[in-house]
Amino acid sequence: ETLKESTQQSLWIELFAGGRYSSHSTNDLRKESLEKFLTNAVDLTGFLTKDEFRRLADPELYEGQSKVDLDLNDSGQADITAEQRQERAKQLGAYLEGKDERIISVASGVYDSHSESYQLASNGFEGQKESTSFTQGVSVSLQGKGDKKPEGWRYYRARHLNDLVGAEQIAKEALART
């Protein structure tokens, strides 16, 4: 019944300055805003208490880091349409139709995300990561004894769409947990 879709971008920085550490984030990526954001972040870090134990890692610790592909990204995620997401959510709820006369309500959800990050440190560290995440699940409310209304749910998450547990199994488990 309700379909929501969004795209988000943000910048997150960690500062190690003068023996102090701070982290800052913003989703305002306009050049003039970023300049002020960075200036303020550096200035604010100067007000913090020094922390002798918080510092950049020794470059020897990440020298020769592996370039192995950890298979964190499903390249097909970008091709999934809003209609396909809606159909998957409907399928989750459809498996519960008529399964128990005590069912009051069913809510299903399908979520997927794509994330890219790039890290660069002043001590020479450089790294990047790209990953996807897929989640689908359902919650169900039943009419219990008297005015009790127990609720059960089941959600699964995977890095790749094809690795997700099927809609029928998810629906059965949610009902069994109620």
Where are these regions (language model features)?
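Active-site bordering "gate/hinge" segments
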Residues: E1-T178
